[in-house]
Amino acid sequence: MESRTTGPLTTETYDGPTVAFMILGAALVFFMVPGLGFLYSGLARRKSALALIWVVLMATLVGILQWYFWGYSLAFSKSAPNNKFIGNLDSFGFRNVYGKKFDEDAYPELAYATFQMMFSCVNLSIIAGATAERGRLLPHMVFLFILATIGYCPVTYWIWSPGGWAYQWGVLDWAGGGNIEILSAVSGFVYSWFLGKRNEKLLINFRPHNVSLVTLGTSILWFGWLLFNSASSLSPNLRSVYAFMNTCLSAITGGMTWCLLDYRSEKKWSTVGLCSGIISGLVAATPSSGCITLYGSLIQGIVAGVVCNFATKLKYYAKVDDAMDILAEHGVAGVIGLIFNALFGADWVIGMDGTTEHEGGWVTHNYKQMYKQIAYIAASIGYTAAVTAIICFVLGYIPGMRLRISEEAEEAGMDEDQIGEFAYDYVEVRRDYYLWGVDEDSQRSDVNHRVNNAHLAAERSSSGTNSSSDGNGEMIQSEKILPIHQEDPANR
């Protein structure tokens, strides 16, 4: 028997399971935010690990605030049918969003607004990775608020609002290949260009500081992505289940393909490569999981794994320090997913929700779908790049809105300079050792003393002693000895 719920501010009734499905979907999409934080933190160096978690979480707070005030109204106004570019402010502050948006809806508009709010938050959180190890946090939050208003809201209106030009034209974008993946990738890449490269001397022997965090973040993202894609059906139906399975198929083939490519060159089974491939497959599934066939998703994951793997080299040709490879893994994979909608989109898959009618793509002989998808991709890239560049340019002339931290702060790390707290606060860090005025002979003597103590600790450990101490009773452990005035940049 159908469950019914009556809203407190309206006499309209809603389908209870549908409302619960949307709220659960919103909650699990939000769970992707800490996943992104852990992923970015693990890929960075230790001295900026906490700052990346902070910036991803704060981006979510900014996204919710913007969405409540005017974001939802600009992206989904139902009273602006003649405007194909952006909505109006009729729903400012979630005004009049408590009833049904359309008569045939089985859920309140507030549930839909809340669900879409989490998509906006994920979009901003992806962009936040562009600040990695060198971006000031306050200007970036201002940037995100403005970009959400004049960047994300218009592109979302194009594709998901009934008044948008891409929606009316029949472009296929299931869960945000253009307004989320391409927009975040292009915006992050342009923002990285304005920030400039990190200090190359500090990047010697650079490697992710915690691959376990990378794996944890990827796993959380995959978990949230399943509802990110399947809940985009807005009701628990066959199409949502189909999108769930398509997401898994694209992710596994993407991960396997990327991992094999890395093994071919390094002869090692890279965990970071595996995670990168999984993410590329998930991103490709975002616009296509509710539109293409299951075998199409298998092929899509392979293509995404190969193309995105090689696309990580684009930043070197463009001379842009895209530290988190946002362009390769989100932008390129998002384009692949949108193209696959034209290649493998099927009318019978799209119609599985029982309400949507579309001719599909080449699988069902709708060959004109390709140029529509390409036009949408080009519009999303061009508009996002222009808006991002304008915002960054203007912010650069506003006092206090300098985008980048100083060279000294970059050497110290964003955790110390921007946060004042540390992800790994084991000991007090002194970075002014080169100003102490101690002669090199004294420093070498101290190094030799530490080496001898380390050997002594190792000998005692091998004889059954778990720890040792020097003559002053201080605990000793083996440590890596570096030349005078040199610090291992990969472990900072």
From Swiss-Prot:
The chain crosses the membrane at residues 19-39, 50-70, 110-130, 141-161, 175-195, 211-231, 241-261, 269-289, 291-311, 332-352, 374-394. The modification Phosphoserine is found at residues 442, 445. The keyword Transmembrane helix applies. Belongs to the ammonia transporter channel (TC 1.A.11.2) family. Residues 455-492 are annotated as: Disordered. Residues 40-49, 131-140, 196-210, 262-268, 312-331, 395-492 are cytoplasmic. It is found in: Membrane. Transporter for ammonium (both charged and uncharged NH3 and NH4) to use as a nitrogen source. Can also transport methylamine. The affinity of MEP1 is about twenty times lower than that of MEP2. MEP3 has the lowest affinity. The keyword Translocase does not apply. This is Ammonium transporter MEP1. PROSITE patterns: AMMONIUM_TRANSP. The gene is MEP1. GO terms for molecular function: ammonium channel activity. Keywords: Ammonia transport, Membrane, Phosphoprotein, Transmembrane, Transmembrane helix, Transport. GO terms for biological process: ammonium transmembrane transport; nitrogen utilization. Residues 1-18, 71-109, 162-174, 232-240, 290, 353-373 are extracellular. It is a multi-pass membrane protein. PANTHER family: AMMONIUM TRANSPORTER MEP1-RELATED, AMMONIUM TRANSPORTER MEP2. It comes from Saccharomyces cerevisiae (strain ATCC 204508 / S288c) (Baker's yeast). Residues 461-473 have a biased composition (Low complexity). One of its GO terms (cellular component) is plasma membrane. It comes from the Eukaryota.
